[in-house]
Each structure stands twice: as C-alpha cells, then as structure tokens.
Amino acid sequence: MDTIHMSVTRPPPEKHMAGPGLKTHRPRVMSKSGHSNVRIDKVDGIYLLYLQDLWTTVIDMKWRYKLTLFAATFVMTWFLFGVIYYAIAFIHGDLEPSEAISNHTPCIMKVDSLTGAFLFSLESQTTIGYGVRSITEECPHAIFLLVAQLVITTLIEIFITGTFLAKIARPKKRAETIKFSHCAVITKQNGKLCLVIQVANMRKSLLIQCQLSGKLLQTHVTKEGERILLNQATVKFHVDSSSESPFLILPMTFYHVLDETSPLRDLTPQNLKEKEFELVVLLNATVESTSAVCQSRTSYIPEEIYWGFEFVPVVSLSKNGKYVADFSQFEQIRKSSDCTFYCADSEKQKLEEKYRQEDQRERELRTLLLHQSNV
C-alpha cells in the first residue's frame, strides 16, 4: 500500500489536522515528561509543613541545593561549636598569656583564639585527631559539650547518608527509562476504532506487573449546573487480547477502544482539534532488581492525537534470528490504509441509511418475483 511516513515533530498534511480557530498553546496539567504543572499557591504555613516532613523535602531537593545545604550544615556546626569552645576558653581565662598566670590548666590545650577553637571543633567532629589540640579534665562542661557535638553530628551524618542513598536508589530514575510515543493515533484495529499509543522499556531488565491506565481530564458541567474544571474519567487500555500485566520486553502498542463506554466516544475527525481535554497516561510497574514500585507518566492533548494514522512497526527479525527494536522508527507514523473511518458520523449514517434502503428494495423485488412465480 502507499504510505506517508512522517515524524510527529511536524503536523500531518491533512486539512482536518488544523483549523483557523485552533489554539497553539493549551494549558496542560502534566508535561510530556510526566512532571506536574500545577502550582500550589496561598497555603498557610506551607514552609512549616515542609519542615515537618523534612525527609521528603530533602529527598525532593535538586542535587545542587542538596549539596549546598549539606556543605553549609557541616561548616555551620563546626563554626557554632567552635564559638562555644571559644566562649568556654574565654570564661575560664585560657586566652590570657600563659606567663601572667602560673600553674593554669586550660580547658582545651592550644586553643587561644577563635581560629584555634574552630580547628578543634573541626578535628573533633571529623575525628582527624592531629594531637596538638586536646581537651583536659579541667572543665566538665567542655567535656559534656564535646560529647554533645559528637552525638549531634553523628545523627546529622546518618540523616545525610540516608537521604543520599534514598535519592540515588529511588525508582524515579528507573521510570525515566520508560519511553512513551510523543503522539497518539486513532486507527482501526480488528475492525474497531481505537486510540493507540506506544510504550517501550529502554533497559534489558524487565518490569514486573505492568499496568497501564489513563485519565481523561476535561471540563464537565453537572446536572445541577456545577462546573468541574478537571473532571477525571477512566480510560482503559489493553494489549492484544490482554489488559493486565503485559510483557514489556519489546516496544508495545496499547489500544483503547472507542466504543459506547469510552469517554472519548464523541470524537470525530472534524471536532478532534476543537476539543478541550488532556489524556494522562500512567504506567505502574515493579522493578525486577529492587522490587520497588515505579510510575512513569505522560499526557496527550488534542494536537498530539492524529486521526487516520498508524505507527510504523518498530520490531523486526534480523538475519541471524534475533528480534531488533529500531527506535529510529519509534516516533514515526504513517497514513492508515483503511479509509472507511475518515468520514464523519453524519456521513456514515447517510451511507448506512442508503445501504439499508437499497437492501430493502432488493428484498421487496425478490418477494415480488417469488409471488409472480407462484402465480
């Protein structure tokens, strides 16, 4: 068949794909990469809420802020305890010249300035132990302060190490290796009109218990007149004859049947680009190596859904008998060979009515001929 191969970075050359009244930029709840575009505003005590959930707050930080925060935390603890050591030495009289006071035992040896106190705090916290500066038995409160510093800084180091490991090992990074097709297409599959997307696992390690679902977000007005800005409707997807736990070892094609139960049943080639909705697609899976649950997300708006197109096959069989996934074709679509679903619903009804009338006349003619033959 004659096919038109094209990239989804430019719109298809079809008249029904564009219109003079279309919006070029539509607001979307979720970006193509799966990040939320919702801004949380005017929340009382939001910073206090973040501090109460400090673990999640620190993990969600960007790496540059996290490293800056932790470096500043260490420097501040060294300096803070250094100032306290300096104050203890000042009160005890350790900063006076040693010649002026005979038989004087300082609280901390070789700490006669703020710089020396800072270095003693740093050496104690990092357990460097050069041996020049050391604490004595002269001041019990200095000994207590040293113990408190080691306990507090140990807890800080445990927290820092835990957040670093949690950020590195979280399944979000695994979810980023799941690739969705940039566009969706509407075509026929097994005689049914379907909305189709492609999903691929970019790693060789498998994903267990994969479940793909969709949420249709659009404005809805209730019978009482209430206007719901983002009404959510469930959009079910299936692979071939299976709807649960697909084997995502190769790029897979997921289908949503546009039947009477579908929230997208009113779509036509003419009104597709005029609709106001967003289709959010979620893929939940378990990582094989860590058993952690990950979720990958994307969304599609009407401008990213192409009517009458189909995806170019990605998987092929090589000469040596191995399956090959060519990702250079992953974003390629072509015009569907089946043109029976290009017409609008009204045109389809007219054709069906015409066929019914012709069939009715044929049956009447056969009945008349049969009656005449019997006579």
Curated annotation (Swiss-Prot):
Q: Which GO terms describe its cellular component?
A: monoatomic ion channel complex; plasma membrane
Subcellular location as annotated: Membrane; Cell membrane
BP GO terms, sorted: potassium ion import across plasma membrane; regulation of monoatomic ion transmembrane transport
InterPro entries given for it? Answer: Ig_E-set, IRK_C, K_chnl_inward-rec_Kir, K_chnl_inward-rec_Kir1.3, K_chnl_inward-rec_Kir_cyto, Kir_TM
| Regulation of its function | Channel activity is regulated by variations of cytosolic pH; reversibly inhibited by acidic pH values. Inhibited by Ba(2+) in a voltage-dependent manner. Inhibited by Cs(+) in a voltage-dependent manner.
**Catalysed reactions, as listed in the record:** K(+)(in) = K(+)(out)
Residues on Extracellular side: 88-113, 131-139
Q: Which PANTHER family match?
A: ATP-SENSITIVE INWARD RECTIFIER POTASSIUM CHANNEL 15, INWARD RECTIFIER POTASSIUM CHANNEL
Q: How does it assemble?
A: Can form heteromultimeric channels with Kir5.1/KCNJ16. Interacts with PATJ.
Q: Which family does it belong to?
A: Belongs to the inward rectifier-type potassium channel (TC 1.A.2.1) family. KCNJ15 subfamily.
The protein depicted here goes by the name ATP-sensitive inward rectifier potassium channel 15
Q: What is the lineage of its organism?
A: Eukaryota, Metazoa, Chordata, Craniata, Vertebrata
What gene makes this protein?
Answer: KCNJ15
